[in-house]
Amino acid sequence: MSMPLHQISAIPSQDAISARVYRSKTKEKEREEQNEKTLGHFMSHSSNISKAGSPPSASAPAPVSSFSRTSITPSSQDICRICHCEGDDESPLITPCHCTGSLHFVHQACLQQWIKSSDTRCCELCKYEFIMETKLKPLRKWEKLQMTSSERRKIMCSVTFHVIAITCVVWSLYVLIDRTAEEIKQGQATGILEWPFWTKLVVVAIGFTGGLLFMYVQCKVYVQLWKRLKAYNRVIYVQNCPETSKKNIFEKSPLTEPNFENKHGYGICHSDTNSSCCTEPEDTGAEIIHV
């Protein structure tokens, strides 16, 4: 009876994932309604301007249909790479490995479920080993293993059979050893040990060895079952990768402190509708030598 050894608890249920997907869809619908209101306001404003009286030779404004909704809504959003939902206060996004782009963020609960199903502790893409912090639940909060009714019946029958078998083996060994001890006393009195004594001695040795092997195998199975129960009631928290967290801080710092002045005297970029060029400051200290 083979059973998986490593299992990790704190698994998010399908209801939690479906609720998170429902919240993300609700947010998308609200965002689309807001965009439609913005487009309608823009259309009414442009029609009022055209009715106010513009010369017929003037160029007509660009059609509103040319604007896409993706240009109004933000194109880059932090989403979970497993459930493709955004993070919130209840389930924030973490950066557990060196992956970048759309694979950079993941939910703690989604990652725990993936770790349990895949039985691995490293990223399948960048092969970075996750930084984990484990702790056991209090004993009063332990949960039963998720097993089918057939598996539970097999375990109960196995335990019952093992208890009966161990009792029979111990009783048989006790009887054989007692009889053997009596024959040894009789042999010491007569000075002769008959062949039944040696036969019983061999049977006792074989029974004792078989009982030890039986106990070892069954204890090993029960130890594995105990480890499985212990792992099921263990909570594992995956921490952020130190390198990615520092990188995120450095990437966000220039966005929070924009530089509006050209302090170093570098070239200033001018953009136009048709062309864009950069002009560099002239070097007034240079001298032209005619040969």
From Swiss-Prot:
<keyword id="KW-0391">Immunity</keyword>
<dbReference type="Pfam" id="PF12906">
    <property type="entry name" value="RINGv"/>
</dbReference>
<dbReference type="GO" id="GO:0031902">
    <property type="term" value="C:late endosome membrane"/>
</dbReference>
<dbReference type="GO" id="GO:0005764">
    <property type="term" value="C:lysosome"/>
</dbReference>
<feature type="transmembrane region" description="Helical">
    <location>
        <begin position="197"/>
        <end position="217"/>
    </location>
</feature>
<feature type="compositionally biased region" description="Low complexity">
    <location>
        <begin position="50"/>
        <end position="72"/>
    </location>
</feature>
<keyword id="KW-0967">Endosome</keyword>
<feature type="modified residue" description="Phosphoserine">
    <location>
        <position position="253"/>
    </location>
</feature>
<dbReference type="InterPro" id="IPR011016">
    <property type="entry name" value="Znf_RING-CH"/>
</dbReference>
<protein>
    <recommendedName>
        <fullName>E3 ubiquitin-protein ligase MARCHF8</fullName>
        <ecNumber>2.3.2.27</ecNumber>
    </recommendedName>
</protein>
<keyword id="KW-0256">Endoplasmic reticulum</keyword>
<feature type="transmembrane region" description="Helical">
    <location>
        <begin position="157"/>
        <end position="177"/>
    </location>
</feature>
<comment type="function">
    <text>(Microbial infection) Mediates 'Lys-63'-linked polyubiquitination of hepatitis C virus/HCV protein NS2 which allows its binding to HGS, an ESCRT-0 complex component, and this interaction is essential for HCV envelopment.</text>
</comment>
<comment type="subunit">
    <text>Interacts with CD86.</text>
</comment>
<feature type="binding site">
    <location>
        <position position="99"/>
    </location>
    <ligand>
        <name>Zn(2+) 2</name>
    </ligand>
</feature>
<keyword id="KW-1133">Transmembrane helix</keyword>
<dbReference type="GO" id="GO:0000139">
    <property type="term" value="C:Golgi membrane"/>
</dbReference>
<dbReference type="GO" id="GO:0005737">
    <property type="term" value="C:cytoplasm"/>
</dbReference>
<feature type="binding site">
    <location>
        <position position="83"/>
    </location>
    <ligand>
        <name>Zn(2+) 1</name>
    </ligand>
</feature>
<dbReference type="GO" id="GO:0061630">
    <property type="term" value="F:ubiquitin protein ligase activity"/>
</dbReference>
<dbReference type="GO" id="GO:0000209">
    <property type="term" value="P:protein polyubiquitination"/>
</dbReference>
<dbReference type="GO" id="GO:0002495">
    <property type="term" value="P:antigen processing and presentation of peptide antigen via MHC class II"/>
</dbReference>
<comment type="function">
    <text>E3 ubiquitin-protein ligase that plays several important roles in innate immunity and adaptive immunity. Mediates ubiquitination of CD86 and MHC class II proteins, such as HLA-DR alpha and beta, and promotes their subsequent endocytosis and sorting to lysosomes via multivesicular bodies. Possesses a very broad antiviral activity by specifically inactivating different viral fusion proteins. Targets and ubiquitinates cytoplasmic lysine residues of viral envelope glycoproteins with single transmembrane domains leading to their lysosomal degradation.</text>
</comment>
<keyword id="KW-0833">Ubl conjugation pathway</keyword>
<feature type="region of interest" description="Disordered">
    <location>
        <begin position="22"/>
        <end position="72"/>
    </location>
</feature>
<keyword id="KW-0968">Cytoplasmic vesicle</keyword>
<dbReference type="GO" id="GO:0004842">
    <property type="term" value="F:ubiquitin-protein transferase activity"/>
</dbReference>
<keyword id="KW-0472">Membrane</keyword>
<dbReference type="GO" id="GO:0031901">
    <property type="term" value="C:early endosome membrane"/>
</dbReference>
<feature type="zinc finger region" description="RING-CH-type">
    <location>
        <begin position="72"/>
        <end position="133"/>
    </location>
</feature>
<keyword id="KW-0808">Transferase</keyword>
<dbReference type="GO" id="GO:0005765">
    <property type="term" value="C:lysosomal membrane"/>
</dbReference>
<keyword id="KW-1064">Adaptive immunity</keyword>
<dbReference type="GO" id="GO:0006955">
    <property type="term" value="P:immune response"/>
</dbReference>
<keyword id="KW-0812">Transmembrane</keyword>
<keyword id="KW-0862">Zinc</keyword>
<feature type="binding site">
    <location>
        <position position="107"/>
    </location>
    <ligand>
        <name>Zn(2+) 1</name>
    </ligand>
</feature>
<feature type="binding site">
    <location>
        <position position="110"/>
    </location>
    <ligand>
        <name>Zn(2+) 1</name>
    </ligand>
</feature>
<keyword id="KW-0333">Golgi apparatus</keyword>
<dbReference type="GO" id="GO:0042287">
    <property type="term" value="F:MHC protein binding"/>
</dbReference>
<feature type="binding site">
    <location>
        <position position="80"/>
    </location>
    <ligand>
        <name>Zn(2+) 1</name>
    </ligand>
</feature>
<keyword id="KW-0597">Phosphoprotein</keyword>
